[in-house]
Structure formats: C-alpha cells, structure tokens
Regions:
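Covalent nucleotidyltransferase core used to form phosphodiester bonds in nucleic acids
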Residues: 4, 38-42, 46-51
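Short beta-strand segments
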Residues: 10-44, 58-62, 71-75
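Short, basic/aromatic recognition patches
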Residues: 1-13
Length: 123
C-alpha cells in the first residue's frame, strides 16, 4: 500500500470524495507533495469542493490520466487551503509538470481569475 508521501510522486492520483448519501465520486488529478501530505488545485465551484466542504473524507490511489487505478486506495482527510496555500501549490505544480503545468495554471487564471481556484490540502 502506498503512503501519502509516495502518492505525491505520482503523475496522476485518483481522488475519491463522498456525497452526503455515501456514494463515491472519483476524479483523476495532478498532485504535488506538501509537507507530510499532498495537495492539488481545482476550480472553486466544482462538485469535489462541495463534497470536501461537507466531509473531508477522501481516498487516494495511483492512476493513469483516464482514472484507471493501478494501486490500492488509502484513506485521508482533505481541507480547503487559503490564498497562501494556493500560490504555493501553484508553484509546485509548475515545477512538477513543467510547461504543461504552467499553461494549465495560466488558462485557469485567465478563465477564473485569482480567486476562482482553490488549493486542497490532503493529509
């Protein structure tokens, strides 16, 4: 079983959040290591943000770009970061994902502005 720190080195991680009725919703995404945990960047109005606000319970598993898991899932807790976290995680995504990361973050900033995107911290 992978640890959160090991998942931070993966290119894609499958994040599973849970609806109020307990149904799971999975999404593949980019992650960066963040201290003893990991973090990701997401638009503020997404379903995953609503579900994380409701309950910070998540699972994480290594996956490919299409969300096909290739390892065991681990339980974790997620929380929404502040603007300082958002800037730090954005820089981490640029370092880890290079030009594609920079272009993705620029597109997000142009579409949504500074406050349209959130950092989610997972531990």
């Amino acid at each position: 079983m992978a640890t959160i720190e090991q998942l931070g080195a993966e290119k894609y991680v499958l994040l599973t959040t849970f609806r109020r009725d307990g149904r799971a919703v999975s999404t593949p995404l980019w992650v960066v290591p963040d201290g003893a945990g990991l973090a990701f960047w997401t638009p503020a109005g997404t379903g995953k943000v609503k579900r994380i606000r409701n309950s910070g319970r998540v699972t994480l598993a290594p996956c490919d770009v299409r969300g096909n898991s290739h390892g065991e899932a681990i339980e974790a807790n997620a929380r929404i970061g502040d603007s300082t976290d958002r800037r730090r995680i954005g820089e981490g995504l640029k370092r880890k994902y290079g030009l594609l990361g920079r272009l993705t973050l620029l597109g997000s900033k142009l579409r949504r502005g500074e406050d349209g995107t959130l950092a989610i911290l997972v531990s």
